[in-house]
Amino acid sequence: SRSKVKKLILSNNLKINQVIVNDPSYVLKLGDNIEFCIQPEKIQSLKPYEYKLDIVFEDDDIIVINKSSGISMHPGAGNYDNTIVNALINYNKNSLSNIGDELRPGIVHRIDKNTSGLIVVAKNNQAHEHLSKQFNKHSITRIYQLLIWGKIRPSKGKIETLITRSSKNRQMMEVSRTKGKKAITNYETLQIFENDKTPTLSLLNCKLETGRTHQIRVHMNYLGNSIVGDDKYKKKFKKIK
């Protein structure tokens, strides 16, 4: 990121034409020779987390877990200890795939922290590769149930857009007309709740054809029907008493 590069420059880690330069505003000239000294980041060791996993299926290759809302999938900024991965280390640290990120052993796919539902964990690299191929080919069906503000018309349909990182908040995603990755969400209204005392709510099933970051949340927000309880992509509605 820009801030990391600036910090490297201010810490005398940049040489231009073999001379240390610690001025981030230095303007490069044609022919300048640039050297960066970048120290490898220290990998956080994964600590076991005593957390009761709701295991619905397990064999020699996979573990299927019913993830609760409120727990992150894997370690990240601000939380390196209390995640599903840490709980898996505590449960079965010697039998998890090690393909990819060292902080995500066994993790083939993810769901958001405040989302509950089934996740599949790979216990070995062969299972990880097979599962990854299935997710990439979209041969695994993923259906999510959610409660949204308002009601969608038509009550059943497909949302197909490009999704990219928000230009205003790098921790959020947004729909774009010109850039990003294709995102496809099929939705169906199951039930509508409406009365004179509270805002209208709708219960939906959403089936994903792609798996972009925050895809359903972004698509619902794009339609103007954000998910109830979603503080990041919420619309302003009066509180339900």
Describe every region a protein language model picked out:
Residues S1-K241:
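RNA pseudouridine synthases
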